[in-house]
């Protein structure tokens, strides 16, 4: 069937409903409001927005999030330096909270961090904009922005 091109770059793996987390992962999942509470309680945690630079700048991003793209345009290739760039902003023993647009890329990014030895990885469920509604709009069903949590854009 026809698939919106913007959907494609998240990969077909993300399109299959992930019921159980892959084995060997200790990743935890937080709803946006839970993520805010977690970050307030754990000042040592590092909040990473792993969307593309364009999304981060122009769609807006959560206040306090560091930007490290998991994949970026024009070809949406995986950023080979992702883990190294996260290591620059966070040590391996600090909790990492990951957010993307709707919660798919952040799971893949989180698995890569776990493989690299990060002990405490959290994924923000529904991401910044949430899933598409029946009118193909994001930001109406769930997600960071719809829940009225602090965000900014340029």
Where are these regions (language model features)?
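Conserved G/P- and acidic residue-centered "switch" motifs that form tight phosphate/ATP-binding loops
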Residues: 49, 103
């Amino acid at each position: 069937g026809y698939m919106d091109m913007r959907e494609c770059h998240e990969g077909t793996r993300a399109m299959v409903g992930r019921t159980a987390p892959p084995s060997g992962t200790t990743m935890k999942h937080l709803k946006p409001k839970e993520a805010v509470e977690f970050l307030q309680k754990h000042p040592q945690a590092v909040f990473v927005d792993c969307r593309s630079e364009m999304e981060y700048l122009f769609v807006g991003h959560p206040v306090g999030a560091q930007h490290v793209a998991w994949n970026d345009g024009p070809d949406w290739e995986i950023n080979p330096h992702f883990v190294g760039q996260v290591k620059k902003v966070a040590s391996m023993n600090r909790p990492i909270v990951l957010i993307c647009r709707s919660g798919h890329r952040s799971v893949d990014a989180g698995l890569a961090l776990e493989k690299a030895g990060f002990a405490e990885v959290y994924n923000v469920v529904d991401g910044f904009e949430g899933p598409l509604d029946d009118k193909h709009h994001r930001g109406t069903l769930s997600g960071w922005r719809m829940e009225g949590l602090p965000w900014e854009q340029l």
